Protein backbone atom coordinates (compact mmCIF):
# COMPACT_ATOMS: atom_id res chain seq x y z
CA UNK A 1 0.00 0.00 0.00
CA UNK A 2 1.52 3.29 -1.13
CA UNK A 3 0.13 6.64 0.01
CA UNK A 4 0.05 8.97 -2.97
CA UNK A 5 -1.93 11.93 -1.64
CA UNK A 6 -2.24 13.48 1.82
CA UNK A 7 -4.91 16.09 2.52
CA UNK A 8 -5.07 18.04 5.77
CA UNK A 9 -7.98 20.40 6.31
CA UNK A 10 -9.53 22.21 9.24
CA UNK A 11 -13.24 21.64 9.66
CA UNK A 12 -15.73 23.31 11.98
CA UNK A 13 -17.92 21.29 14.32
CA UNK A 14 -21.16 23.02 15.26
CA UNK A 15 -23.20 21.79 18.23
CA UNK A 16 -26.94 22.12 18.66
CA UNK A 17 -26.23 23.85 21.97
CA UNK A 18 -23.15 24.22 24.19
CA UNK A 19 -22.39 21.08 26.20
CA UNK A 20 -21.80 21.89 29.87
CA UNK A 21 -18.73 20.39 31.54
CA UNK A 22 -16.81 21.29 34.68
CA UNK A 23 -14.07 22.65 32.38
CA UNK A 24 -16.59 25.04 30.84
CA UNK A 25 -19.13 24.65 28.04
CA UNK A 26 -18.03 22.94 24.83
CA UNK A 27 -19.28 24.94 21.89
CA UNK A 28 -18.43 25.16 18.20
CA UNK A 29 -14.82 24.15 17.64
CA UNK A 30 -12.28 23.34 14.96
CA UNK A 31 -11.08 19.86 14.19
CA UNK A 32 -8.57 18.63 11.60
CA UNK A 33 -9.59 16.12 8.93
CA UNK A 34 -6.86 13.90 7.48
CA UNK A 35 -7.33 12.00 4.20
CA UNK A 36 -4.79 9.49 2.90
CA UNK A 37 -5.24 8.22 -0.66
CA UNK A 38 -3.42 5.21 -2.10
CA UNK A 39 -2.48 4.37 -5.67
CA UNK A 40 -5.76 2.49 -6.23
CA UNK A 41 -8.03 5.34 -5.14
CA UNK A 42 -8.83 4.13 -1.63
CA UNK A 43 -9.10 6.98 0.87
CA UNK A 44 -8.54 6.53 4.59
CA UNK A 45 -9.88 9.16 6.97
CA UNK A 46 -8.73 10.30 10.39
CA UNK A 47 -9.65 13.17 12.68
CA UNK A 48 -7.56 15.19 15.11
CA UNK A 49 -9.88 16.82 17.63
CA UNK A 50 -8.01 18.50 20.51
CA UNK A 51 -10.21 19.63 23.39
CA UNK A 52 -9.07 21.96 26.17
CA UNK A 53 -9.11 20.24 29.54
CA UNK A 54 -8.95 16.79 27.95
CA UNK A 55 -5.88 16.85 25.67
CA UNK A 56 -2.52 18.60 26.06
CA UNK A 57 -2.45 19.80 22.45
CA UNK A 58 -4.32 22.51 20.56
CA UNK A 59 -5.77 22.44 17.06
CA UNK A 60 -2.71 24.42 15.91
CA UNK A 61 -0.43 21.79 17.46
CA UNK A 62 -2.33 18.95 15.81
CA UNK A 63 -2.39 20.57 12.38
CA UNK A 64 1.33 21.39 12.55
CA UNK A 65 2.17 17.83 13.64
CA UNK A 66 0.19 16.40 10.73
CA UNK A 67 1.97 18.66 8.24
CA UNK A 68 5.37 17.65 9.68
CA UNK A 69 4.42 13.99 9.41
CA UNK A 70 3.18 14.40 5.83
CA UNK A 71 6.37 16.14 4.74
CA UNK A 72 8.69 13.57 6.31
CA UNK A 73 9.06 10.88 3.67
CA UNK A 74 11.29 8.84 5.95
CA UNK A 75 8.82 8.82 8.85
CA UNK A 76 6.71 5.71 8.33
CA UNK A 77 5.41 6.03 11.89
CA UNK A 78 3.02 8.29 13.75
CA UNK A 79 3.42 12.04 14.38
CA UNK A 80 5.31 13.38 17.37
CA UNK A 81 4.14 16.08 19.74
CA UNK A 82 0.37 15.71 19.41
CA UNK A 83 -1.69 12.72 20.62
CA UNK A 84 -4.69 13.79 18.57
CA UNK A 85 -2.56 13.97 15.42
CA UNK A 86 -1.29 10.45 16.16
CA UNK A 87 -4.89 9.34 16.53
CA UNK A 88 -5.79 10.84 13.16
CA UNK A 89 -2.93 9.10 11.35
CA UNK A 90 -3.49 5.76 13.09
CA UNK A 91 -7.21 5.86 12.27
CA UNK A 92 -6.62 6.83 8.64
CA UNK A 93 -4.04 4.08 8.14
CA UNK A 94 -6.37 1.48 9.64
CA UNK A 95 -9.23 2.72 7.46
CA UNK A 96 -7.02 2.46 4.39
CA UNK A 97 -5.70 -0.99 5.30
CA UNK A 98 -9.21 -2.32 5.87
CA UNK A 99 -10.42 -0.99 2.52
CA UNK A 100 -7.47 -2.61 0.76
CA UNK A 101 -8.32 -5.89 2.51
CA UNK A 102 -11.99 -5.54 1.53
CA UNK A 103 -13.31 -5.50 5.07
CA UNK A 104 -14.19 -3.22 7.97
CA UNK A 105 -11.70 -1.91 10.51
CA UNK A 106 -13.25 -3.90 13.35
CA UNK A 107 -13.12 -7.14 11.34
CA UNK A 108 -9.55 -6.37 10.25
CA UNK A 109 -8.61 -6.19 13.94
CA UNK A 110 -10.89 -8.99 15.18
CA UNK A 111 -12.58 -11.15 12.50
CA UNK A 112 -15.48 -12.27 14.72
CA UNK A 113 -16.32 -8.86 16.18
CA UNK A 114 -19.94 -7.60 15.99
CA UNK A 115 -21.15 -5.14 13.37
CA UNK A 116 -23.44 -3.29 15.78
CA UNK A 117 -23.13 -2.04 19.33
CA UNK A 118 -25.40 -0.43 21.88
CA UNK A 119 -24.16 2.96 23.04
CA UNK A 120 -24.83 5.28 25.97
CA UNK A 121 -26.50 8.63 25.37
CA UNK A 122 -25.66 11.98 26.98
CA UNK A 123 -28.61 13.83 28.52
CA UNK A 124 -28.25 17.61 28.41
CA UNK A 125 -30.24 20.62 29.53
CA UNK A 126 -30.19 23.76 31.65
CA UNK A 127 -32.67 22.61 34.32
CA UNK A 128 -33.54 19.29 35.99
CA UNK A 129 -36.71 19.12 33.86
CA UNK A 130 -34.68 19.77 30.69
CA UNK A 131 -32.16 17.05 31.54
CA UNK A 132 -34.93 14.63 32.45
CA UNK A 133 -36.73 15.34 29.18
CA UNK A 134 -33.50 14.74 27.24
CA UNK A 135 -32.96 11.46 29.10
CA UNK A 136 -36.55 10.36 28.51
CA UNK A 137 -36.21 11.07 24.80
CA UNK A 138 -33.01 9.02 24.68
CA UNK A 139 -34.62 6.13 26.54
CA UNK A 140 -37.68 6.21 24.28
CA UNK A 141 -35.39 5.98 21.25
CA UNK A 142 -33.80 2.79 22.58
CA UNK A 143 -30.88 3.84 24.79
CA UNK A 144 -30.51 1.74 27.93
CA UNK A 145 -27.65 3.74 29.48
CA UNK A 146 -27.72 7.51 29.94
CA UNK A 147 -24.93 9.80 31.12
CA UNK A 148 -25.52 12.96 33.14
CA UNK A 149 -23.00 15.74 33.72
CA UNK A 150 -22.63 16.73 37.36
CA UNK A 151 -20.27 19.13 39.11
CA UNK A 152 -21.37 22.14 37.06
CA UNK A 153 -23.18 23.70 40.04
CA UNK A 154 -23.99 22.95 43.67
CA UNK A 155 -24.27 19.36 44.89
CA UNK A 156 -27.96 19.89 45.64
CA UNK A 157 -28.52 20.93 42.01
CA UNK A 158 -26.74 17.77 40.86
CA UNK A 159 -29.03 15.70 43.07
CA UNK A 160 -32.08 17.41 41.61
CA UNK A 161 -30.97 16.61 38.04
CA UNK A 162 -30.16 12.98 38.78
CA UNK A 163 -33.37 12.50 40.75
CA UNK A 164 -35.42 13.98 37.92
CA UNK A 165 -33.79 11.69 35.39
CA UNK A 166 -34.25 8.57 37.50
CA UNK A 167 -37.91 9.41 38.03
CA UNK A 168 -38.48 9.89 34.29
CA UNK A 169 -36.59 6.86 32.95
CA UNK A 170 -37.34 4.35 35.71
CA UNK A 171 -35.09 1.66 37.11
CA UNK A 172 -34.48 -0.35 33.93
CA UNK A 173 -32.21 2.32 32.43
CA UNK A 174 -28.66 2.66 33.71
CA UNK A 175 -27.45 6.10 34.74
CA UNK A 176 -23.80 7.10 34.78
CA UNK A 177 -22.41 10.39 36.07
CA UNK A 178 -19.51 12.58 34.99
CA UNK A 179 -18.11 15.35 37.21
CA UNK A 180 -15.03 16.14 35.08
CA UNK A 181 -13.00 16.48 38.29
CA UNK A 182 -15.04 19.45 39.53
CA UNK A 183 -15.66 18.40 43.12
CA UNK A 184 -13.34 18.76 46.07
CA UNK A 185 -12.78 15.59 48.10
CA UNK A 186 -15.39 16.59 50.68
CA UNK A 187 -17.90 17.64 48.02
CA UNK A 188 -17.41 14.35 46.19
CA UNK A 189 -17.93 12.26 49.31
CA UNK A 190 -21.04 14.22 50.27
CA UNK A 191 -22.37 14.29 46.73
CA UNK A 192 -21.88 10.59 46.08
CA UNK A 193 -23.50 9.66 49.39
CA UNK A 194 -26.55 11.64 48.28
CA UNK A 195 -26.52 10.33 44.71
CA UNK A 196 -25.93 6.67 45.54
CA UNK A 197 -29.65 6.19 46.21
CA UNK A 198 -30.29 6.72 42.48
CA UNK A 199 -28.11 3.69 41.68
CA UNK A 200 -25.54 5.22 39.30
CA UNK A 201 -23.51 2.72 37.30
CA UNK A 202 -20.34 4.71 38.08
CA UNK A 203 -19.11 8.29 38.30
CA UNK A 204 -16.38 9.60 36.04
CA UNK A 205 -13.73 11.88 37.55
CA UNK A 206 -15.53 12.92 40.74
CA UNK A 207 -12.28 14.63 41.79
CA UNK A 208 -9.22 15.67 39.79
CA UNK A 209 -5.92 13.81 40.04
CA UNK A 210 -5.01 10.18 40.56
CA UNK A 211 -4.05 10.55 44.22
CA UNK A 212 -7.40 12.16 45.03
CA UNK A 213 -9.30 9.51 43.07
CA UNK A 214 -7.47 6.68 44.85
CA UNK A 215 -8.26 8.19 48.25
CA UNK A 216 -11.94 8.76 47.40
CA UNK A 217 -12.35 5.24 46.04
CA UNK A 218 -11.67 3.83 49.53
CA UNK A 219 -14.88 5.37 50.90
CA UNK A 220 -17.06 6.06 47.86
CA UNK A 221 -20.47 4.37 47.76
CA UNK A 222 -20.35 4.63 43.94
CA UNK A 223 -17.85 2.98 41.58
CA UNK A 224 -15.17 5.36 40.31
CA UNK A 225 -14.10 5.79 36.68
CA UNK A 226 -10.91 7.59 35.69
CA UNK A 227 -10.98 9.70 32.53
CA UNK A 228 -9.00 12.91 31.94
CA UNK A 229 -6.75 12.34 34.97
CA UNK A 230 -5.30 9.45 32.97
CA UNK A 231 -5.09 10.99 29.51
CA UNK A 232 -2.05 9.08 28.25
CA UNK A 233 -1.07 5.39 28.24
CA UNK A 234 1.54 6.09 30.93
CA UNK A 235 -1.02 7.80 33.15
CA UNK A 236 -3.51 4.96 32.68
CA UNK A 237 -0.86 2.49 33.85
CA UNK A 238 -0.23 4.69 36.89
CA UNK A 239 -3.96 4.91 37.65
CA UNK A 240 -4.23 1.13 37.60
CA UNK A 241 -1.19 0.62 39.81
CA UNK A 242 -2.47 3.18 42.35
CA UNK A 243 -5.94 1.66 42.56
CA UNK A 244 -7.45 4.96 41.47
CA UNK A 245 -10.49 3.52 39.70
CA UNK A 246 -12.85 0.62 39.15
CA UNK A 247 -13.36 1.59 35.50
CA UNK A 248 -11.03 3.21 32.96
CA UNK A 249 -12.50 5.49 30.30
CA UNK A 250 -10.57 5.30 27.02
CA UNK A 251 -10.84 8.10 24.48
CA UNK A 252 -8.96 6.89 21.39
CA UNK A 253 -8.81 10.43 20.02
CA UNK A 254 -6.90 11.53 23.13
CA UNK A 255 -4.77 8.41 23.66
CA UNK A 256 -3.12 8.39 20.23
CA UNK A 257 -5.57 6.29 18.23
CA UNK A 258 -7.22 2.88 18.13
CA UNK A 259 -3.96 0.90 18.12
CA UNK A 260 -2.58 2.54 21.25
CA UNK A 261 -5.99 2.34 22.92
CA UNK A 262 -6.28 -1.40 22.23
CA UNK A 263 -2.92 -1.97 23.93
CA UNK A 264 -3.98 0.13 26.91
CA UNK A 265 -7.30 -1.74 27.16
CA UNK A 266 -5.52 -5.09 27.27
CA UNK A 267 -3.33 -3.96 30.18
CA UNK A 268 -6.30 -2.52 32.07
CA UNK A 269 -8.27 -5.73 31.70
CA UNK A 270 -5.29 -7.81 32.78
CA UNK A 271 -5.48 -5.85 36.03
CA UNK A 272 -9.15 -6.82 36.42
CA UNK A 273 -10.72 -3.45 35.59
CA UNK A 274 -13.47 -2.58 33.12
CA UNK A 275 -12.88 -0.28 30.14
CA UNK A 276 -15.34 2.10 28.50
CA UNK A 277 -14.61 3.53 25.05
CA UNK A 278 -15.96 7.05 24.65
CA UNK A 279 -15.77 9.97 22.27
CA UNK A 280 -13.94 13.27 22.68
CA UNK A 281 -17.04 15.11 21.45
CA UNK A 282 -15.38 15.01 18.04
CA UNK A 283 -16.93 14.59 14.61
CA UNK A 284 -18.16 11.37 13.08
CA UNK A 285 -14.80 10.37 11.60
CA UNK A 286 -13.34 10.05 15.09
CA UNK A 287 -16.52 8.54 16.51
CA UNK A 288 -16.55 5.81 13.86
CA UNK A 289 -12.91 4.96 14.56
CA UNK A 290 -13.74 4.64 18.27
CA UNK A 291 -16.81 2.49 17.53
CA UNK A 292 -14.78 0.06 15.42
CA UNK A 293 -12.22 -0.16 18.22
CA UNK A 294 -14.93 -0.87 20.82
CA UNK A 295 -16.29 -3.67 18.66
CA UNK A 296 -12.85 -5.13 17.95
CA UNK A 297 -11.79 -5.31 21.60
CA UNK A 298 -15.23 -6.34 22.86
CA UNK A 299 -15.66 -3.22 25.02
CA UNK A 300 -19.44 -3.54 24.90
CA UNK A 301 -20.43 -3.55 28.59
CA UNK A 302 -20.32 -1.00 30.17
CA UNK A 303 -21.73 0.55 27.02
CA UNK A 304 -19.45 2.79 24.95
CA UNK A 305 -20.18 6.50 25.16
CA UNK A 306 -20.42 7.05 21.43
CA UNK A 307 -23.81 8.64 20.76
CA UNK A 308 -22.40 12.16 20.62
CA UNK A 309 -22.86 12.80 16.89
CA UNK A 310 -26.49 13.41 17.84
CA UNK A 311 -25.31 16.58 19.61
CA UNK A 312 -23.96 18.08 16.37
CA UNK A 313 -25.69 20.44 13.98
CA UNK A 314 -22.77 20.44 11.54
CA UNK A 315 -20.50 17.40 11.25
CA UNK A 316 -17.38 16.76 9.19
CA UNK A 317 -18.65 13.53 7.59
CA UNK A 318 -21.80 11.44 7.23
CA UNK A 319 -23.24 11.50 10.76
CA UNK A 320 -22.56 8.47 12.95
CA UNK A 321 -25.83 8.68 14.87
CA UNK A 322 -27.37 5.75 16.74
CA UNK A 323 -30.55 4.09 15.55
CA UNK A 324 -32.65 2.57 18.31
CA UNK A 325 -29.76 3.06 20.73
CA UNK A 326 -27.37 1.16 18.43
CA UNK A 327 -24.51 2.09 16.13
CA UNK A 328 -24.31 -0.01 12.97
CA UNK A 329 -20.83 -0.44 11.54
CA UNK A 330 -20.08 -0.51 7.84
CA UNK A 331 -18.20 -3.18 5.91
CA UNK A 332 -15.69 -0.98 4.07
CA UNK A 333 -13.06 0.58 6.30
CA UNK A 334 -14.79 2.65 8.99
CA UNK A 335 -18.17 2.85 7.42
CA UNK A 336 -20.56 4.81 7.13
CA UNK A 337 -23.28 2.18 7.69
CA UNK A 338 -25.12 3.95 10.50
CA UNK A 339 -27.01 7.17 9.70
Task: Identify what each model region corresponds to.
Residues 1-175, 180-189, 193-196, 316-339:
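N-terminal capping/lid subdomain adjacent to the active-site entrance of alpha/beta enzymes
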Residues 298-308:
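Short helix/strand-capping turn motifs
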Amino acid sequence: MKICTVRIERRLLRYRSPIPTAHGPVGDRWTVLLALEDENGHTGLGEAAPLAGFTPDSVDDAEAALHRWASDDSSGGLPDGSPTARAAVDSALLDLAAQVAGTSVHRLLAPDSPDRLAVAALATGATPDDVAASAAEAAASGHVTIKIKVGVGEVDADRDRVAAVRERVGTDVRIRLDANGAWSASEAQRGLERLAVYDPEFVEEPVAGLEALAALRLTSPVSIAVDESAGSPKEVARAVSMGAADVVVLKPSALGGPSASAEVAARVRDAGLDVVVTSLLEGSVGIRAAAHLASAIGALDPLPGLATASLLDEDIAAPCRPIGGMLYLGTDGVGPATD
